């Protein structure tokens, strides 16, 4: 009874606290981003409050308390006020244009004292006490900000970020979260989802009552996990938000839960482990995991000890996923999963005339009766053609007979996927009526290696279909080899089972054998596959030995395989000079825990060239980005430190930054009241401009001043303390890029 009373008191306390917190502007209560949004290498720790796209909106204290700290930086929150509240919380108001006048004066004095734009000043509880609703600053666009807004964080007494929509504000919201797609991820060695060892993505469909449903019964074998593409919305805005809580139930039992109430800063680095990172890197979108791998740390948003990794008994199981926003609006996803086991079939022709053909689908391994089937047609070159409709279908004892138009099989290969009586999918079977002379000697295999978090696949694609073909993988060295059979998953595509990462140990070559009848052809591929893992250093080299990686004890979450490909087709390099091949670090879709080192050797004739750097390709920004590099001219190698598996190359940057859109303009004449700010637009097309003070110098009448720099907009600005005197004035400005290319300008103007 005492425990129940305590819970009620806590709930009432939270509610009263929420009602007692003021919105920090006099504008509408709208925000563009909310707490917990995943930014790959961190979480968004607050609310991005809209200011109507304007700078200079009054920012109000949301509670009673005192200003405990001010800070200014080119990056992060830009200009920010920190408040300690009487309720014991810490509030951060970021991206401000300016502080209140008295704080602004202190800030300017601190800049002069430090001779720097960057200021970090603490205050005592007696210095600047404020009441709820007091003015504390004016909104802006400083720091890492894409548009004018206020970044507001609501933290605990220990400076741990809390969800403001749960702990501070109660905002009206009558819009339920949206569920879009479901991913099913095979985890264990032999796991299958709808007869495939690869991750599968399915759309979710909403009924008239608002409940979402799986498109069909899912068939699973072995251990697997769910991941979901879902978002929250709010009336009156088109923005997409992070939901507050999500629950996974299997047959009424809660198996997993995420709840975005608080996230300590030290846990931000684990953001990659919360999403299905490989799918995001493959441009499939952001899916949040409804499971946690053993090697991934449990963090504050994990509110249950269950891992969410599922191994279901044979039979039918009910799945419910609840998605809840901060206001309590709930979206429900329902589906059925059939726990099953691997099964195969064969197809035999039982009837044919000029218009139709009937095939008998006969269960083999697994032996359960077949109750339905899905059939796709493919061209001889392996391209999917269409899903075929049956003229008729019927169960005949354990078999399943399908009748198809004769025209649908002409010069086509049929991929037949049976469905057994439990709803489980049967491994694909390929049937054809093609008359061809192409044999194993006539086709060329293309090899693809996929290394997942718990195993790797070898997959080949043939450039033409070959009848009754087997494919075999051989991992060889100079003395011996290990062979692995490959399953046909499409007419021209074959894949191994998920293999342990250690199979590549001592491997020097990858041989693919294609067999059809008595004919056989073997193709050799050269990959330097290296087994890596946590707790040890490893060295990986490209085939030409000119590109290398050094992984560190803290680089990886789990055992894996790493290699380096030299690529022939790559994103265009529009500026600068490419001075090495482009190398792709693999696997490109692996979530990395820590940093690693890369190196690229260059030709001897480039030893005296300046401004060489390692660049990586950022697929989201669609541009080559400089990675801080060291040049060892004696060893003819550039080295850098990276955190993601990207394409890298050496580029030489000889172009200076661009200076444009300067105010006041050269030769300009201005009234003093019209001249309260210096503004300069800069840009650099290759190595970029570092967000630190060594990148700039700005003098007004031969006196150093300390401007702000907005790294997204690439704008330098300085607010004048007081009107300039009448007469002539001079601005001297210099900007440097990361390669120390430099541009300077001098502006003369007159105040009248």
PLM features per residue range, with description:
Residues 17-91, 97-102, 116-126, 131-132, ...:
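Surface-exposed, glycine-biased beta-strand/turn segments
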Residues 172, 187, 199-342, 376-409, ...:
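Long, low-complexity serine/threonine/glycine- and acidic-rich segments characteristic of extracellular
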Residues 165-219, 336-356, 432-451, 653-676, ...:
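Short, compositionally biased P/S/T/A/G/V-rich stretches that sit at domain boundaries
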Residues 201-248, 351-362, 448-459, 591-598, ...:
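Contiguous beta-strand segments within globular domains
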Residues 233-239, 366-370, 465-468, 607, ...:
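Extracellular acidic loop/turn motifs
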Residues 4-13:
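Sec-dependent N-terminal signal peptides
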Residues 444-446, 531-539, 568-618:
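Proteolytic processing hotspots in large secreted/extracellular or virion-associated proteins
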Residues 470-483, 551, 588-648, 686, ...:
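Proteolytic-maturation and junctional protease-sensitive modules
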């Amino acid at each position: 009874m005492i425990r129940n009373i305590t819970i009620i008191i806590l709930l009432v306390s939270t509610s009263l606290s929420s009602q007692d917190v003021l919105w920090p502007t006099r504008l509408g209560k709208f925000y563009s981003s909310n707490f917990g949004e995943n930014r790959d290498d961190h979480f968004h720790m607050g609310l991005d409050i809209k200011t109507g796209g304007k700078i200079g909106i009054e920012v109000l204290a949301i509670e009673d308390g005192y200003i405990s700290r001010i800070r200014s930086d080119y990056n992060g929150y830009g200009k920010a006020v920190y408040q300690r509240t009487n309720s014991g919380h810490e509030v951060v108001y970021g991206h401000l244009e300016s502080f209140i006048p008295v704080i602004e004066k202190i800030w300017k004095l601190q800049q002069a004292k430090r001779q720097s734009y960057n200021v970090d000043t603490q205050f005592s509880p007696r210095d600047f006490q404020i009441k709820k609703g007091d003015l504390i600053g004016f909104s802006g666009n400083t720091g890492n900000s894409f548009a004018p807004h206020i970044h507001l964080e609501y933290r605990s007494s220990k400076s741990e970020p809390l969800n403001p929509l749960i702990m501070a504000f109660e905002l009206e919201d009558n819009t339920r979260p949206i569920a879009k797609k479901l991913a099913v991820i095979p985890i264990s060695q032999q796991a299958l989802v709808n007869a495939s060892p690869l991750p599968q993505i399915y759309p979710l469909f909403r009924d008239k009552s608002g409940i979402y449903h799986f498109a069909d019964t899912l068939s699973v074998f072995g251990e697997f996990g769910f991941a979901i593409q879902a978002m929250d919305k709010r009336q009156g805005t088109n923005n997409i938000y992070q939901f507050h809580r999500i629950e996974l139930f299997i047959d009424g039992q809660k198996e997993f839960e995420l709840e975005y109430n608080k996230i300590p800063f030290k846990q931000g680095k684990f953001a990659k482990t919360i999403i299905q990172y490989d799918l995001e890197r493959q441009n499939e979108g952001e899916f949040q995991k409804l499971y946690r791998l053993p090697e991934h740390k449990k963090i504050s948003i994990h509110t249950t000890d269950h891992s969410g990794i599922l191994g279901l008994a044979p039979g039918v199981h009910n799945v419910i996923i609840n998605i809840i926003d901060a206001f309590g609006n709930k979206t429900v996803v329902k589906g059925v999963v059939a726990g099953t086991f691997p099964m195969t079939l064969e197809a035999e022709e039982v009837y044919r005339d000029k218009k139709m053909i009937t095939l008998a689908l006969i269960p083999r391994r697994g032996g359960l009766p077949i109750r339905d089937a899905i059939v796709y047609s493919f061209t001889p070159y392996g391209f999917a053609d269409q899903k075929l409709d049956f003229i008729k279908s019927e169960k005949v004892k354990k078999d399943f007979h399908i009748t198809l138009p004769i025209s649908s099989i002409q010069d086509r290969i049929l991929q037949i996927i049976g469905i057994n009586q439990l709803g489980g999918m049967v491994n694909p079977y390929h049937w054809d009526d093609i008359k061809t002379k192409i044999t194993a000697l006539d086709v060329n295999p293309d090899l693809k290696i996929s290394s997942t978090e718990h195993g790797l696949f070898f997959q080949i694609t043939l450039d033409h279909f070959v009848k009754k073909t087997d494919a075999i993988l051989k991992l060889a060295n100079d003395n011996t080899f290990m062979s692995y059979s490959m399953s046909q998953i499409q007419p021209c595509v074959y894949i191994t089972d998920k293999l342990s990462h250690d199979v590549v140990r001592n491997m020097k070559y990858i041989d693919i054998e294609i067999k059809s009848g008595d004919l056989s052809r073997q193709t050799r591929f050269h990959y330097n596959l290296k087994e890596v893992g946590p707790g040890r250093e490893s060295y990986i080299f490209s085939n030409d030995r000119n590109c290398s990686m050094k992984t560190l004890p803290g680089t990886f979450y789990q055992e894996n395989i790493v290699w380096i490909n030299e690529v022939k087709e790559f994103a265009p390099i529009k500026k600068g000079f490419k001075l090495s091949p482009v190398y792709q670090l693999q696997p490109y879709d692996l979530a990395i825990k820590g940093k690693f080192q890369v190196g690229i050797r260059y030709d001897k004739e480039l030893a005296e060239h300046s401004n060489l750097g390692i660049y990586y390709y950022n697929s989201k920004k669609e541009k080559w980005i400089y990675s801080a590099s060291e040049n060892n001219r004696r060893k003819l190698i550039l080295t850098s430190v990276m955190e993601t598996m990207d394409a890298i190359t050496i580029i030489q940057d000889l172009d200076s930054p661009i200076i444009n859109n300067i105010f006041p303009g050269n030769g300009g004449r201005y009234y003093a009241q019209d001249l309260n700010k210096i503004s300069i637009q800069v840009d650099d097309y290759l190595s970029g401009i570092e967000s630190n003070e060594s990148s700039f110098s700005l003098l007004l009448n031969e006196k150093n001043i300390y401007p702000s720099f907005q790294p997204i907009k690439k704008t330098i600005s300085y607010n004048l303390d007081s009107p300039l005197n009448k007469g002539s004035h001079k601005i001297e400005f210099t900007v440097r890029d990361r390669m120390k290319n430099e541009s300077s300008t001098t502006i003369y103007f007159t105040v009248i």
